[in-house]
Amino acid sequence: MENQLLHTASTICHIAFASTGITTPSDEQGFFDLSDSIHNRLRAISPDLHVRCASYLFLPVIHTELKTGDLKNHFPAYILQLVQELAPLKRTTCPSGKIRFDKELEAMFSASPDAVSIRLAEYLSGPSRFLRMIKNPDRKARVEKILTARKCNLSHQLSLLMQAEETVSRFKSPGIT
């Protein structure tokens, strides 16, 4: 399950970059080279699976919001350095929505790895977020291309999301929605 979460988180990271109009100045291979570079950096930065998963999910958001001065105070230096290395990336369109930073950040840097796991699973268990990314036919084609290159498909991806949702429902206390 942990390997599936990491794989799903990394794939969502790549999809988030592509579907919100962030591109590299080079060709598609350059994009995947950069993605692999991000993966290797995160692996070297932290052996903690939960931190790596959460970092994947936040990279596109951090890159978008980094110009907000207060936001810099929420992230450790290694994440900010990694984002600075993504400087060649350019945003050509605005994202359709914003992640609720306070709640996400609290979970991401919680002292409890379980809290991070649960929050990550909650993030991954929102199929509507994933489906919104592929609503536009052009985006769907780009996403499918990315997933194909990473040897997975939409049905497999949604299956992982559903598994994460089931995991979260087992952890949640009765009465908490």
Predicted feature descriptions by range:
Residues 1-177:
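Active-site helical microenvironments for divalent-metal-assisted chemistry
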